Amino acid sequence: MKGKVDLREPVIRKKDVLILEDGHFKPANVCIVTGAASGIGRATTLAMAANGVKVLCADVDEAGGEATVKMAQKLGGHAQFCRVDLTRDEQMEACVAQAAKLGAIKFLANIAGIQHIDAIENFPMAKYDLMQAIMLRAPFCLAKLVIPHIRKSRDGIGAVGNMASIHAHITTINKPVYNIVKFGLRGLTQSIAAEGDGKIRSFSISTGFISTPLALKQIPSQAEQRGITPEAVVRDVMLGKSRIKEMMTPIEAANLFVFGFSQHSRFLIGGDLLYDGGIVKTYR
């Protein structure tokens, strides 16, 4: 890679959004997106809103969530914010109830995530519990709440998309809980698909590093720890095994949700969209 690393979250432009013709992409239908205040969640909110679906953007960050709503409106879409703590069942229930008032819930994008880097023997159990709650238990709970809404919709068709990772395929040191929950999300994905009778689909998305705040804020600390430049962290550490030496953007990941939710993916039932620049499947 050339030049200095830009640690700012990329700007999302309408021309970057994948727009698809789809009978379910209309204002009468609703998509719930978690982690919508920034990164992939924000981008997915904007992408689904730009495709004509009403979006309930859920996040604990109220300022970021409201900013996402305004961005969606600038793209000509409709979004509404719901503040939710994904460790609280009653708040998730309230969020789904709010979404149901907007229209027929058809889509759920489980994207919210946090990170903690530590070896197993040093890993704080409180942090384990928090990551497990936000990144695996909450997606299960939300799917449990959303599936009945999809079933009772006019045609009973809908989909749940889960944001996995290359860490749902391979593990790396000092990320034990991230590895665990991402592998678990693939199990949840396949379980939903198995019970969906071909009408309620589920899929996961596995990418390498994406230029989200979660990933970008790791770069300076990793550079300091390793005694290398931020550029070297991205090129040699984050993208060391990737055939493409640049980070994927949030909207590129969001477009995978658009595709996965669309009629073009009607045979994507329990499958995983692995878009990782060759990290998992190739080597030298």
Q: Model-derived features: where do they sit?
A:
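Substrate-binding pocket helix/loop in short-chain dehydrogenase/reductase
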Residues: 119-120, 124-132, 238
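Conserved glycine-rich Rossmann-like NAD(P)H-binding loop of the short-chain dehydrogenase/reductase
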Residues: 53-67
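Active-site helix of classical SDR
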Residues: 143, 181
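Residue(s) in the substrate-gating loop at a strand-loop-helix junction
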Residues: 165
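Short C-terminal tail/terminal secondary-structure segment
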Residues: 2-21, 25, 170, 258, ...
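Active-site loop immediately N-terminal to the catalytic Tyr-X3-Lys motif
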Residues: 121, 170-177, 216, 245, ...
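Short, small/polar-rich loop/turn modules that mediate ligand/substrate recognition or access, typified
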Residues: 197-201, 268-270
